[in-house]
């Protein structure tokens, strides 16, 4: 496969910002970058993180909560959910049961990691919190819907129709034949009944054969249409493949968490390159469809899947440590667990808001891909579908970044970026705005601790020094000097 220039730039490590490094270069360089530390829970997090500007060290806890609040509002908008919608109206929720309470619970988990020094008693009591219970309830609903979705897809996309009917529908076929014979027998006596039975049997078998022929033909053309997407391999670059595999990897990890007891520290994910590659083919294609062995894409997929296995093991280890450290064994590990490893993998360094927001967006991206897998391949090409996702990410980020700037900064004209407010006035204005917005927090806002947050974001100093500040197109979220 020819290596096309990647459109995505990403953070090469959690200590430095490199916006000029392609998402996938030579394997040796890729391995070297990965050895410097896992930046994200999956390769998709790197894609999401590339759109975000590092936040200044002067960021206060209050301002941080505003930032996260705006993001939760953007997420709710993406999910099609608003407080005015009827919670029972499934159509309004775009097929995903999640609301502000659930997102609030996610944020509380983030707050505890972003600010370990919160006042005693401010932390949630995980096993008693109403928001925790609500989050678990929504998870169960979503998980149930996801299972039904997968089961329905498997039912309609299984190409082994003939074997399935012969193996599992024998009784039904016999019943149809017997019914035809029974109608004939009761309608015309023994002789006429035998003839009618023969006719009924012939009609039944004829209909069955017609159905099988139609289904086989349909599967054949679906397969041919899928193969057309791979006729020109240079149109599918490494970036697209990484995005697809990342979504599948996230989905697979969720299914593993669902069936395992997280109290066992020795637990290992059963993810391996072969199984991930098999999942890729079985979900995004018909089960009978296999990529031609001569295509380099197969080798590329296996290489990426192998690295996904390494990443998954490390993520899983850190998640176990997080659960044990926070005495949260009683909480079932569900979908929101995917966002924890992105900032909990290294307890020695404070996490950045960049990673936090990237993790949230990537989590929803993977979930969206999983729920939409049914007609993904046949409805749109890879390029159109993924470009739509990229555009949505960029648009969402720009929208709420601009809203933050509009609230926190007053300028003398639209082109000026100079704040006319003193720090104290700015803080008062922020507090006033927060009160009007009704932040989704169960408790009162913690006091602003500029000193602690200077330390919290000290790890960003090196990033800030190395960031490209000369470009006027960079969207800044600078909140103070």
UniProtKB/Swiss-Prot annotation:
Coarse class of the protein's main subcellular location: membrane
UniProt membrane topology term: Multi-pass membrane protein
GO cellular component: membrane
Keywords, alphabetical: Membrane, Transmembrane, Transmembrane helix
Residue ranges with Basic residues bias: 1-18
UniProt biased composition (Polar residues): 24-34
Annotated region (Disordered), positions in chain: 1-37
Compartments, as annotated in UniProt: Membrane
Ranges that cross the membrane: 172-191, 195-214
Domain of life: Bacteria
Protein name as catalogued: Uncharacterized protein CBU_1818
Species, as recorded: Coxiella burnetii (strain RSA 493 / Nine Mile phase I)
